[in-house]
Amino acid sequence: MLTLRERQINAIKQMLNLNSQQPKAMAADAVWKILIYDRVGQDIISPIISIKELRELGVTLHVQLHSDRDSIPDVPAVYFCLPTDENLDRIQQDFSNGLYDIYHLNFLAPITRSKIENLAAAALHAGCVANIHRVYDQYVNFISLEDDFFILKHQQSDQLSYYAINRANTRDEEMEALMDSIVDSLFALFVTLGNVPIIRCPRNSAAEMVARKLEKKLRENLWDARANLFHMDATQAGGGVFSFQRPVLLLLDRNMDLATPLHHTWSYQALVHDVLDLGLNLVYVEDEGARKKPKACDLDRNDRFWVTHKGSPFPTVAEAIQEELESYRNSEEEIKRLKTSMGIEGESDIAFSLVNDTTAMLTSAVNSLPQLMEKKRLIDMHTKIATAILNCIKARRLDSYFEIEEKIMSKQTLDKPLLELLRDAEFGQPEDKLRLYIIYYICAQQLPEPELERLREALQSAGCDLTALAYVQRWKSIMNRSPSISQATQYEGGGTRTVSMFTKLVSQGSSFVMEGVKNLVVKRHVNINLRLGSDRVKAKLIPNFLENLPVTKITEQVMECRSNAETDDYLYLAPKLLKGGDVLPKNRAPFQDAVVFMVGGGNYIEYQNLVDFIKQKQTSNVHRRIIYGGSTLTNARQFLKELSALGGEIQTPTAS
């Protein structure tokens, strides 16, 4: 069964095959073409189709729509962009300049009748009507970062951000446009999936606005016999992404949980995003050369190490890098040993030696050289990334922040008073201290004002900008007036208990001990088998019950149709039903598949928690799937900046 990302890839490959229904052509049969995209189209393509794959699909040149371009005759030009006025004006300019002989226009969102008429008039005026071969609405206006993780915007994502949704001076028409943008992308998502969902969401929230607009859009399309996009042939639709049962779309508002986006994480992918600003599966790490030029590292689905370890705790990743390096060195030494034992020195000698049956082992080893070289490239890349993360961990004491925040969120007693930690000049950066304080403020039930005042004074002495606290205070007061919401968002931590350990890490091919860093290994509510060595403690991870973040707890309740005061009050919208309504049916079967979407921005912490949760729920008889998405993807620094912007709109300077 195809995943969301695979279905989007297939849709774009079909577009690049000039919207032909035939199977994907080989490079030898591909029609050579030019790909012209706007920035949104570029953001959609870049995480899922590499430049090498574009070449194999016959794309000889890929350029920005608004860049300076020369005329290229006799080659199809495939446009992939939003039907905005700015983009359409540029396409009309291309018509007038006669840049191409063959035009294939593919719009990310449906183009309105008036705009298509204006485009046709421009083509008629330019005398190129016959040159326009196809005009398509593609319904792929979302960004697939993983098989089960998507966002709606990358560049200019502030248009759909938490700040944009919650700022005080947003006009009604601006909010309508923002919600329509989210709805259009979610509609495109379900067209790509080939399924019509049941919609659940909390009432009186931005999520409800999205839910009602989306239900209306789905219902209108379903009951339009001519334009129905969900009546595809089963063989074409691939039976839809999910099982025969309809999926549930759980729309949630970022306001339900402000602590998790600020949490110092310990899993590899979330750490890369938090510390190194991972974006569209690409991260830039400063090279160790004399120039120290940032080097791009592509973390895609073809990277076996990344696919295996992106959700692992960082110390586990470090040990895995060391093991991969040792495996590579053993393979390299084996080839050298075989060559030496047979008296082979150069590549030319290998060709002569292949006639001998005794060289079968050497032949196999030599044939594996390309795979070994790729393995070495990935080892070097992940060593570079891990070293950059390690430097941040040491400088900012991120391991200690992770452990302290886990204890706060799971209501455990801290080893040291928070005030002492905030006053420690060596304890992280001002931003880290502010994140820790906000998590403490959110998770604590009742806090004396004198204690808060002392904590705020410590933050100010550390150089923290306290603007965000005014907004967090207002947010918490609203949450406290909504008992059902407050109950649903009780924190239990990100699913970990921790045990200190020392471990080896690698840097440029050599291992070293993380001096001064207290490494943490995930402990799943069971005893960890410890074996004392001469200089470190080794720990074995044992999977067991996983504590869940608020989004995961709510997802579990909705999928299993558990009776709960808070989720029972959620809207229940079924676009396929002839009579619309929002009343919860009496008889409901548990959902096997869910799309969880966070209005106001998602993060890798919640994504990984959902991934871990669904792994725990899999059995031989039950196969459940969850797709997680957000209007944007923000790390803690970006989210803190949004909170500060909202706090700046409030007169009260600090939280109390």
Swiss-Prot record:
Region described as 4 X approximate repeats: 85-496
GO annotation terms (biological process): vesicle-mediated transport; wing disc dorsal/ventral pattern formation
Sequence repeat segments: 85-121, 203-245, 419-456, 460-496
Top-rank lineage group of the source organism: Eukaryota
Ranges that cross the membrane: none
A Pfam short name: Sec1
Bilayer disposition of the protein: Peripheral membrane protein
Subcellular location: Cytoplasm; Membrane
InterPro entries for the chain: Sec-1-like_dom1, Sec-1-like_dom3a, Sec1-like, Sec1-like_dom2, Sec1-like_sf
Cellular compartments per GO CC: cytoplasm; membrane
Alphabetically ordered keywords of this record: Cytoplasm, Membrane, Repeat
Family to which this protein belongs: Belongs to the STXBP/unc-18/SEC1 family.
Physiological role: Non-vital for development.
Annotated protein name in UniProt: Protein sly1 homolog
